């Protein structure tokens, strides 16, 4: 589209070198004048290489990193003071902890003594009940045994005696009655025979008495009278009655055994009551540890060495950042200088486009002023065959890489790079925190070790007192139990011996001695033997053993709080109840690192937002281009496409009119900028209006009178129809 404007005084785009040539002829404008120029030459440009954006950004990053390092050093200095203060607090707390046995032992000693006294009191009651129960059980058992077997013995012996007496009486009665009857019959027969014989003798005596003398008479009646009085001796009945009357009643055994058994038990109960009724544990035998004072902060290089190492890291990092960034800022001048040389050469080459009428002068100015972004746009546009789309692609790239947009992008990248440098420094510091944690852990270990030593010493002394109590009770109480069990065993032996003696005295010379002894061994002897074995077991196991105090009575909780198995870091005795770290000292360092990390995070977010602004700006250009990319191009009849700019010859003042054309020449791909189709026919241009006076400045030129040309310039935008982009 052509714009008609009245003539006005303007500063020409291309200064008319030699416009006041005294010869009045038209001169060729030099592309690289050797004299003084109003624009910067190559040497002038190279003299400002160190002011390039990358060097400035790197120096800004360096300044931000140095500020961060200084802030970290200041924060670490404060953290060191707080850590030393916390160490002093931990030292005081550790001293209080290792002195806790001094205070706790008094209560624990009282608890231990009271526990022993209550145990002894319960032991006394239990012993008395046990002794009484065992006493009665043994007596009951023995009485049941010998009274049961007494009944058995009585039944057997008395039954046998009664049977024998009956048999003897029957035999005596039978013998007495039978012998007398036989004696009487014999007596009668003998008397008859004797009478006859005596008569016969009398007759003989009468005849032969003169010759032989007198024959004696037969007299056996006296002998027969003895037969009449024949009977069994009465001693048989008396012997059997003696056996019957001599069966033992075990009254003596009962009385003897009862007295013997009750004597040791009653003696034991008397001794137990006398010894344990007023038993009091000797509390003075339990020790009370002395107070302790720890001092591991003074003269300890743990905290100082940690913060010295952190200071060394920050100093080293600062030196490295200064060296690297300054070297990078200096080295970046080399490619920037080389870039300026190439840009200068490219500008000289492309400045010739101003003399050609096939190029849009604004495009030429853009290509010359922004060679790299313009070249990128040209390369990206070469993928499209449509000139409209080629121009849109170049426009998008130009929109996204405009100086304001590039400033925003570079600012965002510089901020992100600064955050990266600070993050590297932060991680270098955080890697040293475990060393401080280890050192603080050693502090806790020192406290626990001291506490364990105190606890172990106290436990050893207390256990010694408890062991003495065990020995005393075992000697004075269970010694009596051992004595009583031995006495009971002796009593049972006496019982067995006495019972066996009674049985031997009773049945020793009778046929019942063997069976009675066997019955006794089977029914009583085996039971007594079992009881003796039980009493022997009681004798071997009757002793008291109070549990001893562990060596870590006062240190177990502290040791568990710093052990690896502790799942909650706030359980550490070096931490407060609401702390999330294992101790106060490392919490100070973590607070500093968290603060720095929060600052880095904030700066990262700000840089990301700035980068997002550039992305949004680029997306706006992309969306605008896409809206035109797919829309149909309007024809001239629809209001699109202005008339071609006519070629204007140079005027008498030496200005060169560059015609504006809008249609590219797709056949020209070797040019640094797209060519447009052939020039339109020349149009007569009125130059009646003179140029206004304009002072050129310090170049020493005179004021130029330039005639305004109404059709010299059109719109400064790339035009498609009536649209401007």
UniProtKB/Swiss-Prot annotation:
Glycosylation site residues: 176, 244, 273, 278, 482, 489, 504, 551
Keywords: Cell membrane, Conjugation, Glycoprotein, Membrane, Transmembrane, Transmembrane helix
Top-level taxon in the UniProt lineage: Eukaryota
Protein name as annotated: Plasma membrane fusion protein prm1
Gene: prm1
Function: Involved in cell fusion during mating by stabilizing the plasma membrane fusion event.
Family, as annotated: Belongs to the PRM1 family.
Main location: membrane
Organism: Aspergillus terreus (strain NIH 2624 / FGSC A1156)
A single BP term in Gene Ontology: plasma membrane fusion involved in cytogamy
TM region positions: 54-74, 137-157, 319-339, 395-417, 603-623
Signal peptide: none
Extracellular topological segments: 1-53, 158-318, 418-602
GO annotations of cellular component type: mating projection tip; plasma membrane
Compartments where found: Cell membrane
Segments on the Cytoplasmic face: 75-136, 340-394, 624-725
Membrane topology field: Multi-pass membrane protein
């Amino acid at each position: 589209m052509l714009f008609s404007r009245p003539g006005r005084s303007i500063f020409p785009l291309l200064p008319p070198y030699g416009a006041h040539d005294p010869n009045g002829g038209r001169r060729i404008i030099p592309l690289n004048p050797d004299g003084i120029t109003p624009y910067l030459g190559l040497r002038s440009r190279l003299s400002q290489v160190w002011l390039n954006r990358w060097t400035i950004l790197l120096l800004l990053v360096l300044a931000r990193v140095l500020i961060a390092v200084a802030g970290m050093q200041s924060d670490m200095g404060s953290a060191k003071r707080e850590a030393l203060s916390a160490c002093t607090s931990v030292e005081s707390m550790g001293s209080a902890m290792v002195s806790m046995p001094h205070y706790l032992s008094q209560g624990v000693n009282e608890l231990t003594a009271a526990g022993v006294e209550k145990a002894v009191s319960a032991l006394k009651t239990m012993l008395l009940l046990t002794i009484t129960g065992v006493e009665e059980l043994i007596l009951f058992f023995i009485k049941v045994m010998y009274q049961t077997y007494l009944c058995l013995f009585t039944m057997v012996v008395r039954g046998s005696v009664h049977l024998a007496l009956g048999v003897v009486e029957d035999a005596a009665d039978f013998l007495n009655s039978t012998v007398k009857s036989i004696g009487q019959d014999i007596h009668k027969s003998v008397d008859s025979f004797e009478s006859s014989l005596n008569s016969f003798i009398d007759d003989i005596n009468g005849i032969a008495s003169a010759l032989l003398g007198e024959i004696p008479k037969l007299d056996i009646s006296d002998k027969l009278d003895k037969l009449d009085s024949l009977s069994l001796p009465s001693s048989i009945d008396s012997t059997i009655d003696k056996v019957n009357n001599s069966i033992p009643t075990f009254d003596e055994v009962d009385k003897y055994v009862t007295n013997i058994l009750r004597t040791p038990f009653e003696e034991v109960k008397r001794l137990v009551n006398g010894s344990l009724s007023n038993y009091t544990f000797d509390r003075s035998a339990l020790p009370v540890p002395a107070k302790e004072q720890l001092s591991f902060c003074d003269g300890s290089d743990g905290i100082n060495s940690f913060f010295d190492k952190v200071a060394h890291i920050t100093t080293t990092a600062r030196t490295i950042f200064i060296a690297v960034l300054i070297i990078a800022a200096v080295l970046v001048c080399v490619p920037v200088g080389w870039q300026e040389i190439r840009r200068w050469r490219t500008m000289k080459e492309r400045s010739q486009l101003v003399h050609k009428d096939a190029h849009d002068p604004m495009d030429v100015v853009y290509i010359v002023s922004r060679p790299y972004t313009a070249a990128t746009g040209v390369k990206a546009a070469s993928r499209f065959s449509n000139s409209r789309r080629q121009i849109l692609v170049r426009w998008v790239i130009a929109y996204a890489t405009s100086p304001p947009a590039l400033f925003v992008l570079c600012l965002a990248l510089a901020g992100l790079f600064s955050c990266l440098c600070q993050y590297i420094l932060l991680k270098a510091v955080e890697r040293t925190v475990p060393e401080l944690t280890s050192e603080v852990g050693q502090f806790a270990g020192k406290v626990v070790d001291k506490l364990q030593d105190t606890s172990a010493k106290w436990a050893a002394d207390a256990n010694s007192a408890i062991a003495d109590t065990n020995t005393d009770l075992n000697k004075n109480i269970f010694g009596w139990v051992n004595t009583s069990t031995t006495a009971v065993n002796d009593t049972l032996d006496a019982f067995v011996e006495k019972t066996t003696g009674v049985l031997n005295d009773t049945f020793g010379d009778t046929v019942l001695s063997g069976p009675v002894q066997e019955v006794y061994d089977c029914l009583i002897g085996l039971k007594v033997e079992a009881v003796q074995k039980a009493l022997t077991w009681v004798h071997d196991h009757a002793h008291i053993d109070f549990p001893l105090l562990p060596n870590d009575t006062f240190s177990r909780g502290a040791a568990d709080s710093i052990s690896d198995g502790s799942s909650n870091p706030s359980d550490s005795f070096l931490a407060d109840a609401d702390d999330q770290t294992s101790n106060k000292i490392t919490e100070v360092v973590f607070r500093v690192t968290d603060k720095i990390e929060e600052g880095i995070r904030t700066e990262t977010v700000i840089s990301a937002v700035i980068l997002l602004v550039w992305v949004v700006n680029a997306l706006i250009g992309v969306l605008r281009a896409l809206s035109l990319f797919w829309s149909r191009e309007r024809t001239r009849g629809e209001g699109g496409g202005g008339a071609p700019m006519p070629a204007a010859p140079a005027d008498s003042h030496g200005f060169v009119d560059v015609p504006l054309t809008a249609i590219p020449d797709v056949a020209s791909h070797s040019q640094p900028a797209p060519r447009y189709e052939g020039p339109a026919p020349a149009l007569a241009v009125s130059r009646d209006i003179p140029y206004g006076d304009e002072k050129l400045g310090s170049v020493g030129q005179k004021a130029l009178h330039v005639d305004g040309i109404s059709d010299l310039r059109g719109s400064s935008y790339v035009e498609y129809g009536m649209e401007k982009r």
